[in-house]
Regions:
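Generic surface-pattern signal
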Residues: 22, 26, 38, 42, ...
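Short, charged/polar micro-motifs that form catalytic or ligand-binding hotspots
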Residues: 7, 38-41, 74-81
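Polybasic, proline/glycine-rich intrinsically disordered low-complexity segments
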Residues: 68, 72-133
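Feature targets compositionally biased, intrinsically disordered low-complexity regions
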Residues: 21, 56, 65, 75-78
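Terminal domain-start segments
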Residues: 1-38
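Compositionally biased, low-complexity repeat tracts
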Residues: 18, 34, 53, 72-75, ...
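Amphipathic, interaction-prone secondary-structure segments
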Residues: 25-68
Length: 133
């Protein structure tokens, strides 16, 4: 059975991340995601991000852009990712890094694994896995 995603509306953009991350979302998680996007792609310049809830309990964000992103990762991966694949990759990097913080360790580790489960069905699975390896 495949994991389904749902784009969050304006109210859900507040309530869904709050249920998962609490008050840490607007102060630690969300800014970290944006910073990570800039680290992974020189052509990321900010902007609005869509937020998605997965029916397995996962959550991720992706830029609301029609332009793919050239990505250069710390592991040596270089390539171009669609907006959705870029968002998945950025969130996976952010969750991985934040899983080492005392307060967010359990939540971010869980979100990492839920998101990784979802990406295994993504059309760009091989590119994303290469980027996060």
């Amino acid at each position: 059975m495949s994991i389904q995603r749902k784009i969050l509306n304006d109210v859900e953009r507040i309530t869904n991340p709050a249920k998962i991350f609490g008050t840490h979302f607007p102060f630690r998680v969300e800014p970290f995601v944006y910073d990570m996007a800039g680290t992974l792609s020189r052509n990321y310049v900010g902007g609005f991000w869509n937020m998605y809830a997965l029916d397995n309990g996962g959550f991720y964000m992706a830029p609301d852009s029609g332009t793919p992103f050239h990505v250069s990762c710390m592991n040596g991966y270089e390539g171009t990712l669609s907006v959705d694949a870029f968002g998945l990759t950025v969130c996976l990097y952010a969750y991985s890094n934040l899983s080492f913080s005392e307060v967010l360790a359990e939540t971010c580790a869980e979100q990492y694994h839920l998101l990784r489960e979802y990406l295994l069905e993504h059309p760009e699975v091989h590119e994303i896995l290469a980027a996060i390896d």
